[in-house]
Design a protein with these regions (language model features):
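Low-complexity intrinsically disordered segments
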Residues: 2-18, 105-154
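Terminal domain-start segments
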Residues: 1-46
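Compact, glycine/acidic-enriched structural inserts
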Residues: 78-121
Length: 154
């Protein structure tokens, strides 16, 4: 491993209740409501038992962002697009829903979402807690950048 592949640890910071209304407009501009609604809709498609609820918002030290349902139990995730069925934490499921959202909206011209996709995928590949859920999805596993995968021991 060279010095170029060694990265500082990435951290997630939960957004304080007093800042929740500001963070998404600051990151996504006029598209913030579209991003938020798409994440909720994708979670509804990913998890048949998901019925809405409170979400936690997280900013990442690499400038990305994700949101995850506020719940302690694991979620049964199913995705017909690749035949995936498996359980993952609410945190990992939220990251998956955000990755799918960012990917879809990037193809609709949202450059910020394209950037967020790659930054969040880097975090997901690096963070052991998230990696457990993400790497169950073959589509996401192959997207990890090589230097992140090397540093994460993949």
């Amino acid at each position: 491993m060279t010095d170029e592949t060694v990265k500082e640890p990435m951290n997630a910071h939960k957004v304080a209740e007093t800042e929740r209304m500001k963070v998404m407009p600051a990151l996504f501009g006029m598209r913030f409501a579209q991003v938020e609604q798409t994440v909720y809709q994708l979670m509804d498609r990913l998890c048949s038992t998901y019925q809405g609820g409170q979400w936690e918002l997280y900013t990442l030290s690499n400038s990305s962002f994700y949101m995850a349902p506020r719940r302690a139990d694991k979620l049964l995730i199913q995705w017909d697009g690749n035949g995936f069925t498996g359980e993952m934490s609410a945190d990992a499921a939220g990251i998956v829903a955000c990755l799918f959202t960012y990917s879809a909206l990037s193809f609709q011209g949202c450059e910020t979402c394209g950037d967020m996709y790659h930054l969040l995928l880097d975090y997901g590949c690096f963070c052991p807690k998230a990696r457990i859920g993400l790497f169950q999805f073959p589509d996401l596993r192959v997207g990890c950048r090589s230097e992140v995968a090397v540093h994460a021991g993949l």
